[in-house]
Amino acid sequence: MSEPQSWSVMASQMTSAQLIRVYLDGSMGIGKTSMLNEIPTHSLMGVPVLKVFEPMKYWRYYFTDLVTTVNDTCDRRRRGEFSLFQSSMIVTALQSKFADPYLVFHERLSSKCHRITGTRGNPSLILILDRHPISATVCFPIARHLTGDCSLEMLISMIIRLPQEPPGCNLVIVDLHDEKEHVSRLSSRNRTGEKTDLLMLRALNAVYSCLVDTIMYANHICPYSKDEWESEWLDLPWFDTSLATTFINEPRTDYRGSRVSLHHTLLAIFKRRELCAEDGSLSTTHAWILWGLLMKLRNINVERFNITGLSTTKCVESFMDTMSERLVTHMSWNDAFEIEADVLAYNKEMAM
């Protein structure tokens, strides 16, 4: 392993700093945080590694305990104590608060990420974040909708909040194919107010798997093939209760075709009569929303990371070994120093 380099030495060797930023994301209880805890402070090449942890302190102790309240709300809706309208309003408000820390940090970070230098660069800094804003604005809301805890109208309000993505985003979706192991990991966390909801777990796993295909689709079709997307949309079936059940419960396989079809993306969930004309075409506003979602996803470099059967140590080794294959972006050295200060402040106030 190379000796860790000091910031002053590195700054004197380069005219600008180069950043690799990676978001670790995936279903709850899958082992992301354990991985992040074990990732070293320097890479094998001696590059400093900064880690941004889950804002659990903000979620649990700033005002409302979001984790306990969202689970309690969904339980009460399923017991008939809340209507769908009532639970949707509460869940959406809570989900917005889950998203707030991610969105605030993302805004600060985005202003510092400039043009892409490609891959296999010589980074000055590696930044690894526990979840992307897409988790709280898209993935969890869709899963809550599929489980019947959030209405379609409230879901649309949430996905609009996904921010624009600056160049150089690397999104790693952690996947655990062994459901029994996944349930065991989630149960063993024993967090106050957290429950092992198998339906929600399956819905989340399905959504995250589909997210990868959605980003691949966006990378292919945006921004020049809007007509092709609209044509594919008309061929989609109406997304009804039976399709929702199939989406959640049937095992998904990684799409291996030459190009992902719209049918394999999260957008297929929005083929609803409430959003469309009689011929199936989207209303103008909803077409803007969904096309806008694709445009926001198209700058993301996405990869699946199957951790089935791997120890946490092996997961970390595999994750770090492929770091050179990820996108690198330019930034000023002042920006790099500011990122370090921001990470320290954020973790101190937000993380447990």
Swiss-Prot record:
Chemical reaction(s) catalysed: thymidine + ATP = dTMP + ADP + H(+)
One matching Pfam family: Herpes_TK
UniProt-annotated binding residues for substrate: Q95, R191
Cystine residue pairs: none
Gene3D superfamilies given in the database record: P-loop containing nucleotide triphosphate hydrolases
Keywords linked to the UniProt accession: ATP-binding, DNA synthesis, Early protein, Kinase, Nucleotide-binding, Transferase
Residues annotated as the enzyme's active site: E54
Statement: the UniProt record of this protein carries the keyword RNA-binding: no
Molecular function terms from GO: ATP binding; thymidine kinase activity
Keyword Magnesium listed: no
Binding site for ATP: G26, S27, M28, G29, I30, G31, K32, T33, R185
Its EC number(s): 2.7.1.21
InterPro entries (alphabetical): Herpes_TK, P-loop_NTPase
Listed GO biological process terms: DNA biosynthetic process; TMP biosynthetic process
Subunit-level organization: Homodimer.
Function: Catalyzes the transfer of the gamma-phospho group of ATP to thymidine to generate dTMP in the salvage pathway of pyrimidine synthesis. The dTMP serves as a substrate for DNA polymerase during viral DNA replication. Allows the virus to be reactivated and to grow in non-proliferative cells lacking a high concentration of phosphorylated nucleic acid precursors.
Family: Belongs to the herpesviridae thymidine kinase family.
Name recorded for this polypeptide: Thymidine kinase
Organism from which the protein derives: Gallid herpesvirus 2 (strain Chicken/Md5/ATCC VR-987)
The encoding gene: TK
